[in-house]
C-alpha cells in the first residue's frame, strides 16, 4: 500500500520532460515549444505534506492537447447519444435522411418547421403542437422528420411513428397497454404520421383516442401529419371521431400544405432515369 501511495505522489508531483524542455532560472521545468512552465512550487505547508517543493503544471501546449482530447470525447459522446436517440425515435431508417440540410428548398412551410425547432423551448413550455394537413406528397411527413432530426441533434428525445404501428404494437406486445401509452407520452415531442389512415374499428378508434388523450394530459407537444382536410377535422362523421378530432385541434396549430406533389415528381424523375438507362 505504501508503494502505491508513493507511486500516486510521484505521478502527482513529477513533470515528465520532453527533449526540447529546459530548466528556467527559477529552477522549474519549462516547455521548449511554448516557453511556459510545466511545474509550479507548492506552498510551504503543502510542500511539508508531500515532501516535495514542486508539482506538475500545464503549459500552453499541454492545455491545448487536453482541450482537444476533451472536445473529441465530447463529440464522440454526442454522436453516440444522437445515434441512440434516432435508433429509438424513428420507426423507419429512411427518416434519418429527412433533414433540413437535404431539403430541396421548394416547400414554403419549411420556414415554419425551422422556426419550430428554433423556438422549441417556448413550444415545449407552452405545449404548442402542429397539425400538418394537406394533399398527398406535399412534404408533411418530410418536414415533420426534419423537426425530429434537428431536435435529436440537440439531444432532445423525439418519437415519430403512426397509428398503424401503434395498434400493431398494442395487439402484439406483452407490455401493459397503459404502460406502452405512458412510454409514448414520456417523449418531449411525439410525432404521429399519416393520421387518419389507420383502420376505423371501434377498438382502433378507442386506442387512437387513448393515445391522444394521454398525450394531452401529459402537457407535452404533439405534431400530427394528415391527408384529412381541416373541414374533415372540424366536421367529423360521428361522435367517436368528434372526440378525437376535438382533442387534436385543441393541442395542435393547423398548418396547411399545398402545392406540387413531390412524390409524383420523384417517381417521374426515376422513370425518366430508367428510360434513359434502358434505351442507351
Kindly give the residue locations of the regions a language model identified.
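Walker A/P-loop nucleotide-binding motif
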Residues: 124-144
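A short, basic N-terminal segment
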Residues: 1-104, 265-280
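Residue-level preference for the first positions of well-ordered beta-strands
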Residues: 127-131, 158, 189, 221
Amino acid at each position: 500500500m505504501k508503494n502505491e501511495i508513493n507511486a500516486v505522489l510521484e505521478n502527482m508531483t513529477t513533470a515528465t520532460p520532453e527533449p526540447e524542455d529546459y530548466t528556467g532560472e527559477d529552477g522549474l521545468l519549462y516547455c521548449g515549444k511554448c516557453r511556459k512552465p510545466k511545474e509550479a512550487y507548492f506552498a510551504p505547508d503543502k510542500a511539508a505534506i508531500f515532501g516535495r517543493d514542486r508539482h506538475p503544471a500545464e503549459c500552453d501546449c499541454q492545455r491545448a492537447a487536453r482541450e482537444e482530447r476533451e472536445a473529441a470525447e465530447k463529440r464522440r459522446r454526442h454522436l453516440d447519444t444522437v445515434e441512440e436517440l434516432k435508433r429509438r425515435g424513428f420507426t423507419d431508417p429512411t427518416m434519418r435522411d429527412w433533414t433540413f440540410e437535404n431539403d430541396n428548398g421548394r416547400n414554403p412551410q419549411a420556414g415554419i418547421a425551422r422556426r419550430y425547432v428554433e423556438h422549441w423551448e417556448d413550444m415545449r413550455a407552452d405545449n404548442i403542437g402542429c397539425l400538418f394537413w394537406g394533399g398527398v406528397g406535399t412534404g408533411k411527413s418530410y418536414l415533420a422528420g426534419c423537426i425530429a432530426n434537428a431536435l435529436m441533434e440537440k439531444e432532445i428525445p423525439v418519437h415519430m411513428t403512426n397509428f398503424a404501428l401503434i395498434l400493431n404494437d398494442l395487439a402484439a406486445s406483452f407490455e401493459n397497454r397503459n404502460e406502452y401509452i405512458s412510454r409514448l407520452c414520456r417523449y418531449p415531442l411525439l410525432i404521429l404520421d399519416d393520421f387518419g389512415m389507420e383502420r376505423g374499428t371501434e377498438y382502433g378508434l378507442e386506442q387512437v383516442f387513448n393515445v391522444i388523450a394521454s398525450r394531452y394530459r401529459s402537457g407535452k407537444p404533439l405534431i400530427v401529419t394528415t391527408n384529412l382536410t381541416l373541414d374533415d377535422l372540424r366536421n367529423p362523421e360521428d361522435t367517436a371521431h368528434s372526440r378525437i378530432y376535438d382533442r387534436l385541434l385543441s393541442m395542435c396549430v393547423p398548418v396547411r400544405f399545398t402545392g406540387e406533389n413531390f412524390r409524383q415528381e420523384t417517381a417521374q424523375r426515376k422513370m425518366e432515369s430508367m428510360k434513359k438507362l434502358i434505351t442507351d
